[in-house]
From Swiss-Prot:
UniProt entry tagged with the keyword DNA-binding: yes
Source organism: Acyrthosiphon pisum secondary endosymbiont phage 1 (Bacteriophage APSE-1)
Lineage: Viruses, Duplodnaviria, Heunggongvirae, Uroviricota, Caudoviricetes
Keyword Transcription regulation: yes
Protein name, per record: Probable antitermination protein Q
Role noted for this protein: Positively regulates expression of some phage genes. Bacterial host RNA polymerase modified by antitermination proteins transcribes through termination sites that otherwise prevent expression of the regulated genes.
Biological process (GO), any one: transcription antitermination
Gene name tied to this protein: 5
Length: 148
């Protein structure tokens, strides 16, 4: 089953932010967590079971000594920073941030594939291949050949 890993991670990020999984650090001081009201997000989230599975895959980034990629996943998907903002903060090119995020997303997608587990969100994040029509493809080929 092919999944859109970015949609999976967006849902996981919402779940992780709302449930504070502790994969990064707690935004609330010890002992004060129950005193603040929960702020549910309007973004789509994943189930607790899916969240724990994805959490384990994300935490594997730290196990294989890739803490920078883990921090990018946390910054982008959990905290909601844009790729440009992350690049500015780290004083690096945005293309480098994009490349490292792609590597981290691929790693997490690979972990999920190795587990061969079916997620509750699979029907919503399934990658659909576009229907191929011979006429359209041949028309594109003709235009491409004419350009050359």
């Amino acid at each position: 089953m092919r999944r859109d890993i970015q949609q999976v991670l967006e849902r996981w990020g919402t779940w992780a932010r709302d449930n504070n999984t502790g994969i990064d650090w707690s935004p609330i001081a010890a002992g004060f967590k129950g005193l603040l009201p929960l702020r549910p997000s309007m973004r789509p989230s994943c189930s607790d079971e899916d969240g724990r599975i994805i959490d384990n895959c994300v935490s594997q980034l730290q196990q294989v000594r890739q803490p920078e990629e883990l921090s990018l996943i946390i910054a982008y998907y959990v905290k909601g920073y844009s790729k440009r903002a992350i690049a500015r903060r780290r004083r690096v090119d945005e293309g480098l941030i994009r490349a490292k995020l792609l590597i981290a997303e691929g790693f997490i997608d690979g972990c999920l594939s190795l587990l061969a587990v079916r997620l509750d969100m699979d029907p919503e994040v399934k990658m659909y291949s576009p229907q191929k029509s011979g006429k359209r493809i041949s028309a594109v080929r003709k235009k491409f050949v004419n350009v050359l």
